[in-house]
Amino acid sequence: MKKISLLFLICGLFLVSSCIPTQTIKGDGNITTENIPVSEYDCLELEGGGMVVNYTQSDAPEGLEIKTDRNIFEKYEFNVENHKLKIRPKKEFRKHTNFRPTEFMVTANSRNLKKLAAAGSTHVNINSPLQAEEFEAGLAGSGIIQFHDTASFTNLKIEIAGSGDFVGHKVYCEELNGDMAGSNTIVLGGTVGIAEFSI
């Protein structure tokens, strides 16, 4: 059921992000940096174009910093619901809108991370060692999820639809399950006990 739920989530985000846009909103060049208070979360749901996310697993209190054009910032929402940090356009801009920010940098940290779902052309960098019993990563569109340090899991699930890439050169897990649809790539290094892929 978890696998099906994540597939529905990333495919749903992909459908939203891949609709033919009726309007394009370009960044106005007025770059602003905002620190947004957030409650505890262990899941990231990301949707948008041109977003670069830098995540760190840390014992420090949860934090979120957004750096982007003022007119882009005003059309996005940033909130935590049921331990899920959601970064996405406001409801009236989720369909038929193409965002072209001058810059869209997200810096986030939390104590735990169990699930990551990204849609659109989002580039997610995991910049610290990451540990979790179970971890689910979902990509829809042309995004990238990249682990820059050691990642250790008991169970790892990777699901990609579109032309996205998953990269991790120091991944250690007992069991790996991967689902790939489209012209995507999974690049892994490290040690895996059991691996199963559906292509």
Where are these regions (language model features)?
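Intrinsically disordered, low-complexity terminal regions
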Residues: 1-199
